Amino acid sequence: MNNDVFPNKFKAALAAKQVQIGCWSALSNPISTEVLGLAGFDWLVLDGEHAPNDISTFIPQLMALKGSASAPVVRVPTNEPVIIKRLLDIGFYNFLIPFVETKEEAEQAVASTRYPPEGIRGVSVSHRANMFGTVADYFAQSNKNITILVQIESQQGVDNVDAIAATEGVDGIFVGPSDLAAALGHLGNASHPDVQKAIQHIFNRASAHGKPSGILAPVEADARRYLAWGATFVAVGSDLGVFRSATQKLADTFKK
């Protein structure tokens, strides 16, 4: 049986430096995720760090995205091999790894997603990702179809951006603007010049190593500025933010 994920089109688009517009998914239910999958975004982040997601909520959301053109990207709660292995086995191929500060941490993330000898991923012969053992070439294809995006959101990460970006197997560098702002002493103010300078520096260094860069930017002016700076995969909003904003506007329309 064929696996419709191979080849990984999102990974190929990033490698070709094609702009990929995405959205954050934090509501953690299959219906809202299915709606996002019909909206036309290139990629969607299913958040396992700050949203109430786990294996039991991720599986129905992956099912809801079956047939969608939007590539599911999972943000893992932490850079931990067992967590990553379980998410691989349920069918994720694109990973966003938070709070990467060193080359060694980037290498660990890559190794966690690769079968030996390239990595340390544990082997199960029957799971959702290989359609329960029916994808004949799964083991041959898996390693080269995994996307690893590492998130820089600390001063140490900024300092080590060259080493991180140069890490083999890292497909892109993603900026966490809120945590980066906090780390630089500007909690709640990602628009501060110090933070913006750091963001542009990260983009530039990623590009110097031939790696695409991305960011979450729910404000249109910010998103367009980052695209102008060379970011190629930008999440321009979140389901939670859109839902809150739209419902508040609707209520205000009739109550004010």
Curated annotation (Swiss-Prot):
<dbReference type="InterPro" id="IPR050251">
    <property type="entry name" value="HpcH-HpaI_aldolase"/>
</dbReference>
<comment type="similarity">
    <text>Belongs to the HpcH/HpaI aldolase family. KDGluc aldolase subfamily.</text>
</comment>
<dbReference type="GO" id="GO:0008672">
    <property type="term" value="F:2-dehydro-3-deoxyglucarate aldolase activity"/>
</dbReference>
<dbReference type="InterPro" id="IPR005000">
    <property type="entry name" value="Aldolase/citrate-lyase_domain"/>
</dbReference>
<dbReference type="GO" id="GO:0000287">
    <property type="term" value="F:magnesium ion binding"/>
</dbReference>
<dbReference type="InterPro" id="IPR015813">
    <property type="entry name" value="Pyrv/PenolPyrv_kinase-like_dom"/>
</dbReference>
<protein>
    <recommendedName>
        <fullName>5-keto-4-deoxy-D-glucarate aldolase</fullName>
        <ecNumber>4.1.2.20</ecNumber>
    </recommendedName>
</protein>
<feature type="binding site">
    <location>
        <position position="153"/>
    </location>
    <ligand>
        <name>Mg(2+)</name>
    </ligand>
</feature>
<comment type="function">
    <text>Catalyzes the reversible retro-aldol cleavage of both 5-keto-4-deoxy-D-glucarate and 2-keto-3-deoxy-D-glucarate to pyruvate and tartronic semialdehyde.</text>
</comment>
<dbReference type="InterPro" id="IPR040442">
    <property type="entry name" value="Pyrv_kinase-like_dom_sf"/>
</dbReference>
<comment type="subunit">
    <text>Homohexamer; trimer of dimers.</text>
</comment>
<keyword id="KW-0479">Metal-binding</keyword>
<feature type="binding site">
    <location>
        <position position="178"/>
    </location>
    <ligand>
        <name>substrate</name>
    </ligand>
</feature>
<dbReference type="InterPro" id="IPR017648">
    <property type="entry name" value="GarL"/>
</dbReference>
<feature type="site" description="Transition state stabilizer">
    <location>
        <position position="75"/>
    </location>
</feature>
<feature type="binding site">
    <location>
        <position position="179"/>
    </location>
    <ligand>
        <name>Mg(2+)</name>
    </ligand>
</feature>
<feature type="binding site">
    <location>
        <position position="151"/>
    </location>
    <ligand>
        <name>substrate</name>
    </ligand>
</feature>
<dbReference type="GO" id="GO:0046392">
    <property type="term" value="P:galactarate catabolic process"/>
</dbReference>
<dbReference type="GO" id="GO:0005737">
    <property type="term" value="C:cytoplasm"/>
</dbReference>
<dbReference type="Pfam" id="PF03328">
    <property type="entry name" value="HpcH_HpaI"/>
</dbReference>
<feature type="binding site">
    <location>
        <position position="179"/>
    </location>
    <ligand>
        <name>substrate</name>
    </ligand>
</feature>
<feature type="site" description="Increases basicity of active site His">
    <location>
        <position position="89"/>
    </location>
</feature>
<keyword id="KW-0456">Lyase</keyword>
<dbReference type="GO" id="GO:0042838">
    <property type="term" value="P:D-glucarate catabolic process"/>
</dbReference>
<comment type="pathway">
    <text>Carbohydrate acid metabolism; galactarate degradation; D-glycerate from galactarate: step 2/3.</text>
</comment>
<keyword id="KW-0460">Magnesium</keyword>
<feature type="active site" description="Proton acceptor">
    <location>
        <position position="50"/>
    </location>
</feature>
